[in-house]
Swiss-Prot record:
This protein's name: Mediator of RNA polymerase II transcription subunit 8
A GO molecular-function descriptor: transcription coactivator activity
Keywords: Activator, Nucleus, Transcription, Transcription regulation
Superkingdom of origin: Eukaryota
One Gene Ontology cellular component annotation held by this UniProt entry: mediator complex
Function, as annotated: Component of the Mediator complex, a coactivator involved in the regulated transcription of nearly all RNA polymerase II-dependent genes. Mediator functions as a bridge to convey information from gene-specific regulatory proteins to the basal RNA polymerase II transcription machinery. Mediator is recruited to promoters by direct interactions with regulatory proteins and serves as a scaffold for the assembly of a functional preinitiation complex with RNA polymerase II and the general transcription factors.
Organism per entry: Schizosaccharomyces pombe (strain 972 / ATCC 24843)
Gene name per UniProt: med8
Family that this chain belongs to: Belongs to the Mediator complex subunit 8 family.
Chain segments annotated as transmembrane: none
Localisation: Nucleus
Complexes and interactors: Component of the Mediator complex.
Record keyword Transcription regulation present: yes
Gene Ontology BP annotations: positive regulation of transcription initiation by RNA polymerase II; regulation of transcription by RNA polymerase II; transcription initiation at RNA polymerase II promoter
Pfam families (alphabetical): Med8
Amino acid sequence: MEDISTEKTVESLEAIRHRIAQIVQSLTHFLAILHQSESLSPWPTIHKNFNILLSQIHSLSNNLAAHSHTLQTTSIYPSLEFPVKEQEPLLTTLLRTKALPEVEEWEANTLQEYEASISSQPKKKEANDAYQKDQLWDQARIIFMEERENYSWFDFVTRRQESEGEFVSQRQLEIDRATEEQNANQMLTDILSFMKSGKR
C-alpha cells in the first residue's frame, strides 16, 4: 500500500516537474524572440507565444491544485547515493525556504507600483471628468452660439421701425452683442435649467 502511495507521489511530482520544464523552455524561447532584433517582433508571433505560455501556466496551476494534498504531506530528501558534495549548490537551492533577494525586491517593487497606480486612479478620474465637463460646456456654448446665429430673425431695425422712422444705434447693438457673448455660459445654464424643469 505504501509503495502505491509513493508511486503516485512520484508521478505527481514528475508531472509537475514536466510542466515547469515546459514553462522554462517556453520562456527561454519567448525571450529569444523578443531579443533577437532591435525592432519589436510581429504582433501575431508575440501573441502566439504568449498564449502558449499562458496555457502552460494554467496547466501547471491545475496540476498544483490537483496534487495540493500530496505536496503538503510529502517530504523529499536526497537518497544515500546522492552526490552531496558535487551537487551542493543545487541542494542548497532546492532546500531554500526563503525567496531570493532579487525576487523579494521584484515583489516589493511590484506591490509599490500597484499601490501607486491604485492611489492615483481616483485623481486621474477626477481630472478626466473635470476636463470632459469643460469640453462639454465649450461644445455646448459653441453650438448654442451657432444656433442663435442661425435663428436670429432681426436686423438693425424692424420693418415697422423703418416705416415709422425709428432707428437703432449700431453701436448699441454691438455693445449688446458683446454683453450677450460674455454671459453666454449663464444663458446656457438658464436654458438647460428651463429645459429640465420648465421654470425660468
